[in-house]
């Protein structure tokens, strides 16, 4: 999972605090041998920065909301403070900040704290800028309020004079279709009075639209500053100042790349070697001469996509780095790396389960960590360990699928619809991505393209682009069963930052997901001719004749729904051909309301079914029990909900779950297990939920109820695996034996 920040306790370097982009806050007291989650029951899951008070190492300040500008960024709930080393937290406000990138505690006054807030990514306004408190967080004042699209992305303090601070502002806006990652609001600022007043320090910087800036100050010579500046469309440069920001000199044209500077660009100055700086990037870039020349840091056997770098005070060879694949340690200045493999932080987008015997397998597509598979349980007393899991396909993983009755065939895909059929007996992967024909428009694939295997024929597949495709032979050939089901717009002509922008502005087209695509597909279990499709641009389409004719409905025809809402999920009812469910999502336009509707007359009329779901809760996926039509499960931004009356009422159903997005759910029908794909805390399984089918009002008022026992499999547990590997091997518990 993605690591946002790491803080090492200066008084006890065995103690680390880890802020996870989507996965909460964690603490180790033994250098990563064991871990304790610190915020599982808090109202947030996404964090951007963590700071240890220099006066009191039990005083921890936490900024929530990721500090990157990616399409899958987690949203925060302000600033939190702990006085007991993370055992408990107090809400300190700034709830509308959404993304906090840096917190600094005054080195002489613990009641004075500065907070760099990027502000909302998806909308204007909010609490963005440079906030200061002088009363320990009781009140805050925005000392650098630039405009409704510009926040502060980086902040450093002069180690010899706490009245001198430097800040980097960042103007940006993202929506479902596009990203502008820069603008005239982006600049560098300096304060000489403890952050009360700020002045621009941009002499020597270019006048073009600047994007994300990483800022660093030399610990040895604090008059020396470094700035990694994104310029226009993904270009950039590193600048150096020898006079405390009075002027800047361009050192090189270096900029972070990959998915774009908006995702990296943190700049770190070595505390041990003057003029040695590190630029976070897909691969870390290192300069030994103040930014003139950069080389790629050795990252052999280490995950890419770096975000955080931390040092120990008295060991120049030690490095602790946070990546999209977790935490790594080096004891020899990056010559080799040790993986901290016992943090369950994988970000799963989607999942699928097979029907392998004796234990079924779970497959999931992840952010930055491939498509992975593993067993639902093992024969070993020790449980399910890292070694039981395997990589099915590389890249960012997305929606997988399995073939009923044949666990040897699965489908896995990487981003933008690169779908493969995998033969699990020999590992053979065959691309089965549908392609447009001669003289047809280019096929558009969503970042997370939908695939489903037919209920009616396990060799029949459906796949979504801007069209719906059908294959009768496991993807060897495809036939389009629809035309373009989307609005087919020119996305650069859509308003962003409040208006239509010139093409010459700071668009980051490489960081944009393909737009005007199908995002969700469903087939009726009862009638193979009934199909539903939903799009990312607010359209629901359905056919009752196998794709010969489609009926179109825009989502603004649903009660209280904006036309921009993204179709996260659409499901045909398993028991009734006239009933279906749709989940909509408008958070990429700054709207966090839950939108969910049901039709019981084949799509002619839809009614809202969100009773019991709090405002501000995004809805991701819905599944229906295959036996009891009234029993529904719902994956949301903050856990799982259950309905016992076909969606009329919803109840939180997250006992044992941390606060985390549940992006997908699946039911393993043989075992009656509910499997969850979380975006930051890996998989969770609810074993045999079948008693919930009998949660009737009558049974709830009875003194007792005897449930039918489940069919059991007899087997002997064994000792084995890696149970003697020590605390750094992660184990998940097997279901209870016996």
Residue ranges and their predicted role:
Residues 1-731:
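Beta-propeller blade termini and top-face loops
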């Amino acid at each position: 999972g993605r690591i946002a920040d790491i803080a090492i306790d200066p008084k006890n370097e065995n103690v680390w605090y880890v802020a996870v982009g989507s996965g909460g806050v964690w603490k180790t007291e033994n250098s990563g041998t064991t871990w304790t989650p610190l915020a599982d029951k808090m109202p947030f899951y996404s964090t951007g920065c963590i700071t240890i008070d220099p006066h009191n190492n039990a005083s921890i300040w936490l900024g929530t909301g990721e500090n990157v500008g990616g399409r899958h960024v987690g949203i925060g709930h302000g600033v939190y403070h702990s006085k007991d080393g993370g055992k408990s937290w107090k809400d300190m406000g700034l709830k509308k900040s959404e993304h906090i990138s840096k917190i600094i505690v005054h080195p002489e006054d613990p009641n004075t704290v500065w907070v760099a807030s990027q502000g909302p990514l998806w909308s204007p306004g909010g609490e963005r800028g440079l906030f200061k408190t002088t009363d320990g967080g009781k009140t805050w004042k925005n000392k650098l309020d630039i405009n409704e699209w510009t926040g502060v992305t980086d902040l450093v303090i002069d180690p010899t004079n706490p009245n001198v601070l430097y800040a980097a502002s960042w103007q940006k806006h993202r929506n479902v279709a596009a990203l502008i990652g820069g603008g005239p609001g982006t600049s560098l600022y300096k304060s000489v009075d403890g952050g009360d007043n700020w002045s621009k320090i941009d002499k020597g910087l270019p006048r073009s639209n600047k994007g994300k800036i990483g800022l660093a100050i030399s610990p040895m010579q604090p008059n020396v500053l470094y700035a990694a500046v994104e310029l226009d469309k993904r270009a950039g440069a590193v600048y150096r100042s020898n006079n405390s920001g009075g002027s800047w000199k361009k050192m090189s044209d270096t900029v972070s790349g990959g998915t774009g500077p908006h995702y990296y660009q943190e700049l770190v100055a070595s505390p041990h070697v003057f003029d040695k700086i590190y630029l976070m990037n897909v691969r870390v870039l290192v300069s030994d001469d103040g930014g003139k020349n950069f080389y790629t840091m050795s990252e052999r056997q280490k995950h890419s996509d770096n975000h955080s770098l931390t040092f120990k005070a008295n060991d120049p060879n030690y490095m602790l780095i946070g990546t999209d694949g977790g935490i790594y340690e080096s004891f020899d200045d990056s010559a080799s790396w040790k993986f901290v493999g016992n943090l369950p932080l994988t970000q799963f987008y989607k999942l699928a389960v097979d029907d392998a015997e004796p234990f079924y397998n779970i497959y999931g597509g992840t952010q930055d960590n491939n498509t992975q598979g593993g067993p639902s349980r093992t024969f070993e007393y020790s449980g399910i360990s890292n070694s039981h899991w395997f990589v099915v396909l590389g890249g960012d993983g997305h929606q997988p699928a399995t073939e009923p009755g044949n666990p040897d065939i699965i489908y896995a895909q990487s981003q933008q619809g690169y779908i493969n059929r995998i033969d699990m007996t020999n590992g053979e992967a065959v691309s089965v991505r549908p392609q447009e024909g001669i003289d047809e428009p280019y096929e558009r694939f969503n970042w997370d393209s939908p695939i489903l295997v037919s209920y009616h024929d396990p060799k029949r597949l459906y796949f979504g682009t801007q069209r719906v495709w059908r294959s009768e032979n496991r993807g060897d050939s495809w036939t389009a069963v629809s035309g373009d089901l989307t609005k087919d717009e020119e996305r650069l002509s859509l308003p962003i930052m409040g208006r239509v922008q010139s093409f010459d502005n700071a668009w980051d087209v490489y960081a944009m997901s393909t737009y005007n695509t199908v995002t969700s597909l469903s087939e009726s279990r009862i009638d193979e001719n009934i199909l539903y499709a939903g799009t990312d641009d607010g359209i629901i389409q359905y056919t009752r004749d196998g794709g010969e004719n489609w009926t179109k409905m825009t989502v603004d025809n649903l009660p209280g729904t904006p036309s921009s809402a993204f179709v996260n999920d659409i499901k045909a009812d398993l028991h009734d051909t006239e009933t279906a469910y749709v989940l909509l999502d408008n958070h990429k336009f700054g709207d966090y309301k839950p939108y969910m509707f049901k039709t019981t007359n084949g799509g002619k009329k839809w009614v809202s079914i969100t009773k019991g779901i709090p405002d501000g809760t995004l809805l991701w996926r819905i599944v229906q029990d295959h036996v009891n039509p009234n029993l529904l499960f719902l994956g949301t931004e903050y856990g799982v909900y259950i309905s016992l009356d076909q969606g009329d009422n919803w109840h939180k159903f997250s006992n044992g779950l941390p606060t985390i997005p549940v992006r997908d759910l699946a039911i393993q029908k043989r075992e009656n297990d509910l499997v969850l794909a979380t975006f930051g805390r890996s998989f969770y399984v609810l074993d045999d939920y079948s008693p919930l089918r009998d949660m009737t009002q009558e049974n709830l008022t009875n003194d007792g109820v005897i449930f039918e026992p489940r069919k059991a499999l007899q087997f002997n547990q064994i000792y084995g695996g890696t149970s003697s590997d020590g605390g750094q091997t992660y184990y998940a518990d097997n279901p209870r034996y016996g």
